[in-house]
Amino acid sequence: MRPPCPQLFGFSHSGPSLAIYGRATHPWSRLAALPAVGLMVLASMACHKQPPPPRPYVAFVVNNQSQSVVAVNLAGPQIVATIPVAPLPEEAIQRPGHREVYVVSMSGKISVIEFPELTVAHIIDIGKQAGDLVFSPDGDRAYALEPQTGRIVFLDCNSLKETGQVSLVPNLAHMAITPDGKTLIASDPGSDRLFFVSTSTQKVLGTVKVGKTPGPLAVLRDSSVVFVADTGDEKISAAEISSHTILAHIEMGSRPNGLALKPDGGELFVFSNEGTSMTIVDAFHDNIEQVLPTGRDPVAAAFSPDSSMMYLATAADGFVSAFDITNRTVQSTLHVGVSPVALALTPDEHFLAVADSASGSLALVRTSPLSLITVVPVGSNPVDVIVPGWELGQKGL
């Protein structure tokens, strides 16, 4: 058996975890002149591959009560900008193919932040409220849900003008767009229906009855099937998009309140705030594959691009867990704060940015091994975080 590498350095601190990065300065030409102890140190350093430091990706953190978005340089990590936005911001979404972040506020407005300027360039007025916001695949068009009145507002993202709207029914819950960009789907908890709307004609294509109190939605990559969490029942429903018909009702055992679809579309993860487990559904055959334990109140998930790993935040116990999807195992669990409610994986997959609504902070977490690097205070009630593939000092997309 190969002996373990010796531990070279140790560091403990009563406050937030710290990361110190450095490099050896001895030229290899002087290797023969080093004493035996120096050779042991170099050998151990070679054995221990140092993990890479964070790159200067920018995390955009949405502070609901501070009415701001904080831009954090993860290489610091340090705050590089505090950006005032419309009141009661809830969500940040990157516009596809552009260096813009759209911030949706419950006050009925959308603030458009430009990078690298890190300023609000435009504010779009949607109505009394602004709910879910989705983009066309090319990022040229956006569709905003105004839940209270039940309207879908069509936007041209280049001119920032409204190009139309569709009125459905008041108090809609959620909205999704098919990956091909052709169909919008909205869930109506009042009538237990889904609405299907054409993005080209701006007309209602049809509806379908699902389970009780439909909520969050997830759409397969081929735009064929939509899954909806029936939050008033202990089940989810699957509907065919082209025919607007029900394919299956899948019993869960508890009321679902969240859905997360793997990037490859093969499996759907169903979460419930009533328990401490998640249900894995075969998205192609509509059957339950497995139930895995989680912490209390799973609220946010992030996948690796190859669909091999999932990172899950559980708000009621302050943990982030790493799940090996391939082997169906909990790889590790880490306490990151009081109430983590959102998380984002950096494009290089080495780090997680985790927003904690209770402590008003952003935790920077290394993914391998799962470990806390530091915590940055960001504002009052951070509720969302995204990390686009942009770096400070980088030119072009």
State the predicted function of each range:
Residues 1-3, 164:
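Accessible peptide chain termini
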Residues 3-35:
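Bacterial N-terminal signal peptides that target proteins for export
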Residues 32-44:
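Bacterial N-terminal signal peptides
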